[in-house]
């Protein structure tokens, strides 16, 4: 054989079988950075239509986790695919840099502001800490192969961004959406600050659940409403609550106007009591109270009870009955204890009746000094004391402990309270913001489409947005308020612009250093500076304006896409929508895409305590970033995204299939010159023309899937093409022609041309997902080319040509099926040691008339398709009893071992081996390929 080895066209490539990605990727990254690849891409798209994906800024605290990786990789796939589609798609990464988590980290190091360090020093320490966190996260994102303007990201703490945040607030104020009010807000007593809705998490909590009696002030008036003459003892209205600590702030009892209420007399422990309960809840209440007997004395609609008065159970005043639509009969008594200072529904209904918004609780969760009985007690600790006092007063009907879902601080993981405080709000209704935002939601494309109804419900039900915080590290609310009237300065808008100009030069510290007299002159004594800071959700939510407007890359183009996790419907998508609609009357985005959360193989959330956390850094160091990128792309992100070591191993296996395909392609076009050796598609062997046609059709499907952000469809179709059409069919068939045909014959060049065209297309198909591997392939492709695939567009060289004489795509599909059946028979024969390789087999195909005619079209070339030394076609009706059944009703098979000599060069068993005296071990085909003009192939 050694004599003829040099006559074969053996595959050869520098592209290694093993990716060794963990070691090879960092070398490529270094090259990309040194060559300024991101800028090269930007330069290649000057003047093209822009596509703007605006980055939702991750918080600058801690290492990135797998969810961050998913998010950034999805964005990167989109930006790269849009670039391939010819768009100018800049990507400016951002970071959220203000807020409580950073304050807490800095407090651990330097203490609270005003103690060991001044507030100004504290802010500087926060800035330093955030910058360091950004650097760490940036390195991790770069390692993932994400292309972005990493040298010039946007940080919400950049001076110009801070200034633009102030300018955006000025525009919101100018549009009439800001108001100040005393309202109940989510309040964390550990933070000492209001919380945004997105900063509230719901966890199970054990709480006291109590039924409390409020005795009627005028028993006769009450009985008259129920058309009852008399009853035993006093008549009371009963409330049920899980927050006894809010009872000092009770100012009313709410009933539903349409519900029926019943005056019930019951006996318990020998004593008779008379109470008012919702009719629908009487039986459940009596059961809970453990009464011996009960009877209904009378019935009345809730609206008939309006403004009756009842004594507070332990304070010396009485409260009215009011009507509220928020009252339900889902649980409790059908009567709601109403404390306008401690609940949103309570506040809203209280406003209608002009109730006092009592707030006896301080910032730290302790009752204020003027709170009767409970002064100085922490509210949660006071619960037991309230219960004890109610029992002492004879007002406690039932006391038990229940587990229920309760709001907790996202940072401290501790229960929070609702507490009325003076705050700044963006009003949802005073200028029609809610209605406008709902209209804008309809104009936006939501992916998946359920995102629309989700955010609609949130906007429909959300309260006014409390944008003020009582924190040190944040963008200040740069307003001057009149000391007596609490009115804003009449020149607030122009004053805010002057302050913004200072912040642009000096950062937010400029506000704290500002002497009011510098701006207000003689008026300074009448006004005070607001000391509140903005909710960090305002920082990020205004970035469509504060960032996009200031970056020349965006050319003033509107944002096309926001892409974040599904929790951002109530977070960044919401805050951005509110601010943009308040400022500009329209949504900031055209499309909003959400991805699910990452969970482990058992569907559990990632948790250090469970020990199921998969860190992206570990994956890139062990398997390489391309494996992580392939997992992200292959997973349907519309639901939960499952990841585990086993799943990543499967991704690595899938990656190997793609890599092996690429290696085969490169190894077989080694030395191919696209300028001189390329065979026109119409002159190719039919099988080659078919595979190019398939690749062209696939490219259209892949581009469409990329455009619809269906990356799992991209990977599925790509894997199918590599595994089935190429791996199991085309590449297997062409090996004989590729290796044994004359080196420069049309038969071989046709095949190489097809492989070359597929390689040029495929390297682009995988570039958005397997970026490192695509670059590796690109560097080894033959022909003149730009340095990087990432500056290219989708390949235009795939011509979908079908000649009149061509076999149809359906024909090749049928042949693929026949070949699959033949393979099964050959494999069985190999397992039974009947033959060694497939070329030792001679196959008889017993086919019906239609299939016989189809197979006969290929003539002698059928054996190359079936990878056997000899084939013969016989009528199905002539099949012997021992013919092998297949899954095709039109086909049976026969196999026997070839008896002819084996050609030393091509390994086919042929009767003509040794016919040429000079080459006694070769078939005549091989002699032609060595010494003659080379064999001619028409079909395969």
Curated annotation (Swiss-Prot):
Binding-site positions, ATP: 608
EC number: 6.1.1.5
Motif ('KMSKS' region): 605-609
UniProt keyword DNA repair present: no
SUPFAM superfamilies per the UniProt record, alphabetical: Anticodon-binding domain of a subclass of class I aminoacyl-tRNA synthetases, Nucleotidylyl transferase, ValRS/IleRS/LeuRS editing domain
Signal peptide: none
Extent of motif 'HIGH' region: 58-68
CDD domains: Anticodon_Ia_Ile_BEm (cd07960), IleRS_core (cd00818)
Subcellular location: Cytoplasm
One GO biological process term: isoleucyl-tRNA aminoacylation
Superkingdom to which the source organism belongs: Bacteria
Family matches, as Pfam families: Anticodon_1, tRNA-synt_1, zf-FPG_IleRS
Predominant subcellular localization, coarse grouping: cytoplasm
Keywords from the named record: Aminoacyl-tRNA synthetase, ATP-binding, Cytoplasm, Ligase, Metal-binding, Nucleotide-binding, Protein biosynthesis, Zinc
Co-factor note (free text): Binds 1 zinc ion per subunit.
GO CC, one annotated term: cytosol
Family to which this protein belongs: Belongs to the class-I aminoacyl-tRNA synthetase family. IleS type 1 subfamily.
Subunit architecture: Monomer.
HAMAP family: Ile_tRNA_synth_type1
Cited function: Catalyzes the attachment of isoleucine to tRNA(Ile). As IleRS can inadvertently accommodate and process structurally similar amino acids such as valine, to avoid such errors it has two additional distinct tRNA(Ile)-dependent editing activities. One activity is designated as 'pretransfer' editing and involves the hydrolysis of activated Val-AMP. The other activity is designated 'posttransfer' editing and involves deacylation of mischarged Val-tRNA(Ile).
Name of the molecule in the record: Isoleucine--tRNA ligase
Chain's gene name: ileS
